[in-house]
UniProtKB/Swiss-Prot annotation:
Its main location: cytoplasm. It comes from Syntrophobacter fumaroxidans (strain DSM 10017 / MPOB). [4Fe-4S] cluster 1 binds at residues 22, 58, 92. This is tRNA-2-methylthio-N(6)-dimethylallyladenosine synthase. Binds 2 [4Fe-4S] clusters. One cluster is coordinated with 3 cysteines and an exchangeable S-adenosyl-L-methionine. Its cofactor is [4Fe-4S] cluster. SMART domains: Elp3 (SM00729). GO terms for cellular component: cytosol. Pfam families: Radical_SAM, TRAM, UPF0004. Residues 13-129 form the MTTase N-terminal domain.
Amino acid sequence: MITPLAKTAPAPRYLYVRTFGCQMNEYDSQRALRLLCAVGYRPTSDIADADVIFLNTCSVRDKAEQKVYSFLGRLRRLKAHRPWLKIVVAGCVAQQLGDGLLKRFEHVDLVVGTRGIGSIASLLEEVERSKRRVAHLPAEELQGFTTDKCRTVGTGDVVAQVTIMQGCNNFCTYCIVPHVRGRERSRAPDDILREIDFLASRGAREVLLLGQNVNSYGRGLPDPISFPDLLRRIGKETSIRRVRFTTSHPKDLTEDLIECFAGLPFLCKHLHLPFQSGSDGILKLMHRGYTARQYLEKIARLREVCPEIALSTDVIVGFPAESEEDYLQTLRLIEEVRFDSLFSFRYSDRPLTRAAGFPDKVPMDVKVRRLARLQSIQADITLQKNLAETGTVREVLVEGPSKASNGQMTGRTQQNRIINFQCPVDLTGKIVPVRIVAAYSHSLKGELLSQPGKES
């Protein structure tokens, strides 16, 4: 009698994911991870073990793009030692260069544009089967804005991200986003609500709503809905405890949305509102659609409606034709508003943008000097803001064990400040009262006042 050979399970294939850039890219990377895990891949944190490397890229600034090229260059040696390795490049650099990436990096197997993530599993299968290198840059997301059937993979985080729209119609003269992400496309509200409710059932207590300009959400849908109305529906129809959103454009920040910060208790008291420059002349060249005075009026109204709101922002120094007076106007706006935190960047030409062709470029040494001074001013403001928190009691959503010290938990206030505090038990996912006892440049130290009940 001949005994048939026992069938053995195929060896697992390992997937390494690396993300550059914004939270939208993080969301897309998680989506790709879920889709590939659903067809048998296993995630690994060790790139040397990977059978597939998925690289999600950013081209918003030249520095981010150069990081991508540097990383891809280092992968040549790894591919030489692991010839079966498949290297996938997705995101904004992929959308920007397309086939050019395959020509520049002969070890890259698959290029996936910003609207092709939903096809990642079938594309990778095609590359494996055909032994061909592929660039896939669809004009639109073929799957549309639908919750992935494998959304159960990778859930369980206390804070989850949910894309509500993609693309941008503003075409700021320095920004490549409309060229690589396309025009604004809003996701159906019912689908957003289903995903949020599902995430809440899997342990999420907070969601971050993502879009290049969430304030213009709903335009173009068969049944138009405003962003404030979407927020109200989230509060009524889901069980999520906290909601944040990013990014907002000042010109689209309506009175209705401002009043949501007072009227919706689940909406965190934090807003990221990029101003980019304090000079009206530079704002006009940037095609931002507002003046410095209009921006300040909206800040004043936000603080009138919600005195405890924390504000963060983006700013660019060294935009073409920026004079010393233009720059000083930016500093004056920062000192007047006193942002809780600020992300600042040196201007860099981006392909496809109008500003790349503008004359009167600011020398690099001037941009470096201006950025350093601005960052020093903001660092002092941020520290003073954090020191002012000392002695206050804040509701903190515990996100997990702190990396700062054993025996500590870490979480965030509604104002998006990080707090580390001693705790004898794991309170991940709980909302707890914490008194701030010390403040630092980028975080706070607190003490737990009481442990939560089952409903916290």
